[in-house]
């Protein structure tokens, strides 16, 4: 796994052994950040259900001011910390251990990226409900194309859906 563009372009980052996480594919990550390009510089970013931290690290590489990595899996937390240390970017990042639904509202940001494990469909709705109460400028949800997400949740309205293979990105603002 590698960083696609920006300050840390082509730098390798560790992944988590086994099937406990499903990293965002490089092509989908590139598409995401091509869309975010005008908004990422100087933004604050939350990578919720962070896994390896690849999405939040990509945000930092492309100019985000600060990123929060929300994750509960201990092995994933260790990998995120190792990846941040290898890039010497710890001062611009905060790793938050614990269930995302308990930590999400304590870390407001300009851009929030949600990528819950695909089988946890209720987690998507619950996270969007939380964000809908105190909406960020932009929320992006990575999900399986077969999952139907709401058009609106609280103050958030879906503005765009991008599909690639079995993956989709739903944008809310």
Where are these regions (language model features)?
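Class I S-adenosyl-L-methionine-dependent methyltransferase catalytic core
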Residues: 1-173
């Amino acid at each position: 796994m590698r960083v696609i563009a920006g300050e840390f372009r082509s730098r390798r980052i560790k992944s988590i052994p086994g099937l406990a996480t499903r990293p965002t594919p490089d092509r989908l990550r590139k598409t995401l950040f091509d869309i975010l390009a005008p908004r990422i510089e100087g933004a604050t970013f939350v990578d919720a259900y962070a896994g390896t931290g690849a999405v939040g690290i990509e945000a930092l590489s492309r100019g985000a001011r600060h990123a929060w990595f929300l994750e509960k899996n201990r092995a994933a937390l260790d990998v995120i910390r190792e990846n941040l240390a290898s890039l010497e970017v710890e001062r611009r990042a905060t790793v938050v251990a614990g269930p995302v639904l308990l930590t999400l509202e304590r870390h407001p940001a300009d851009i929030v990226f949600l990528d819950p494990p695909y089988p946890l469909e209720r987690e998507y709705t619950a996270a969007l409900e939380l964000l809908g109460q105190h909406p960020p400028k932009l929320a992006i949800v990575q999900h399986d194309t077969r999952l139907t997400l709401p058009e609106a949740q609280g103050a958030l309205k879906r503005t765009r859906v991008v599909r690639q293979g079995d993956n989709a990105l739903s944008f809310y603002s």
